[in-house]
Amino acid sequence: MIKSKLVSLDEAVADIADGSKVGMGGWIFNAQPMALVRALIRKGARNLDLIPTPGSIAPDMLIGAGCARSTVCVFISFEQFGLAPHFRKQAEAGTLKVYDLDGPAIAGGLRAAICDLPYMPIPDLGTDLPRHAPEFYLPLPSKPGERKMLAAAAVKPDVCLLHAQQADEYGNVQYLGSPFFDAMLAQASRKVIVSVDRIVSTETIRRNNHLTKIPSAMVDMVVEAPWGAHPSASPSLYRGDEKHLKEYVKASVSDEAFSAYLKKYARDAATQPAYLDALGGARLGTLTTSESNLT
């Protein structure tokens, strides 16, 4: 009999050791694994090496909460709200080690990990990034007139945190929007933890098998966390919460205000229902979108 992989948020992050390399799925303000991030903060995680592809509030919150020591990323952005406040603050202060890579290096590094190779060839874009992050770039020889190439070092997370719209209890994960880099990140990682807005029946998964982007064999744990990407969007289910993102940015101005923010929305909100209560149901109702896929 197939074993259920359904666990609680706290159970999902319990074995993530300090010093782990943590991949983070989604794309900026879409499908950020926020419920899992808040669980990591409650756990008191430390010295994590974050690998967002690319991220926004999820890695920034971990950085601000003192959970991270480094990032390997293309960028961490708050787009229309400015630069990611804690990422910027700690990068400028030198308390966060930042490995700044280009897109081909991240993608090539994940592909190398998937293939169990130390490197993967990528085009040389002519930037100075290889000089600043030599651990991740190896020059390759080329003849006159040939395209210059580099070898991107493997990027292999110890664990990756993803958020999708639905899955069954066995970990067959379905996306009602773009999966972004999530499937590649899952293949490259040693352990895969996925939060979903809802658990559905295996029959629903079979009936809509074209939506399955990450099969059960690749997933170690799945967590049912309604609104688990909030305040980022979960495509086809709810929009990003700009009001809350502004609240986060405002709270990030001072250590005292940010500590109060974390207390309210992460440390005191020990479960996902408690987090939703802190937000208010009326607020969430304004963010719901219409679905276009079967469930």
What name fits each language-model region?
Residues 1-295:
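Conserved alpha/beta enzyme-core scaffold
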